[in-house]
């Protein structure tokens, strides 16, 4: 169970769940920037992960800090009185006493201040026998559903008590559901908490199974596509159906010679085996291919003027030769190759020159 699941639960239930070490540890699931040992230490010392990127919070005093601030965390563990006092406890503290509500309407917890007991049922007698011949609502609330919630009939009237948390409910109505009333009135009951944990674990397992099935189907489909000859346009298009890149015109990408091999957003050209990664929405696959791998046979028919680089402009430095060199990464096209080798920064934007591509098909 992670933060996303806790967001949909009542706050009283969230507070109760966070008293459990395994629940706090589960809030760190999916956070990749801390070791498992550090996550275990944080959960053991009563911290849990909150929604902010690197933020954790103390379950007792609610102090927030960065998961990376090791010095402050360890100082807080030593200083937080609630954490020090409560650290030896294995179970959350008993729920506070509750006041009896008005007679009638929803079931109400009795005004009791009885500490929670352990998980093992404390009573040896058959709880079902306490209802037989006494439960006044058997026509619309079955005895079995009450027993399943840990209730025993204590009377008078329709009063029942949970064997685990000792909450007492009464004034049942025809539309009441025992499990819902139990969760609403006693969210910290071990039986209720265990049901939440089981439900979340089952949801996680179901999602994991579904994700693995999707990944397996995707892998099988991609392997089928990769087994084909990528010189064929239709096979490249088939592989690009799985590509997570931002360019939606996959046919244009395929016609440029690229196909997808399943690694991040990297594309590979079938003709020159070049690989390009970190694609952006406005990238032109033909232009990127021509600039980065101008010698590719698949780019032989693509002219530099077709991708926005014309040699009609003069070099801005010597003012004699024609501009014929693309500067990377800024892609400005204002220098002849000779002048470009004499400068370290682009004269237009002042960015450092990392690579020079001469449009007369001399790759530098």
Swiss-Prot record:
Zinc-finger ranges (RING-type): 315-350
Biased composition (Basic and acidic residues): 117-126
Protein keywords: Metal-binding, Repeat, Zinc, Zinc-finger
GO MF assignments: zinc ion binding
Chain positions of BIR repeats: 24-89, 127-193, 236-300
UniProt keyword Metal-binding, yes or no: yes
Keyword Zinc-finger: yes
Entry-linked PROSITE patterns: BIR_REPEAT_1, BIR_REPEAT_2, ZF_RING_2
Renumbered residue ranges of the record's region Disordered: 83-126
UniProt xrefs under InterPro entries: BIR_rpt (IPR001370), IAP (IPR050784), Znf_RING (IPR001841), Znf_RING/FYVE/PHD (IPR013083)
Function: May act as an apoptosis inhibitor.
Name the record gives this protein: Putative apoptosis inhibitor ORF42
Organism of provenance: Ostreid herpesvirus 1 (isolate France)
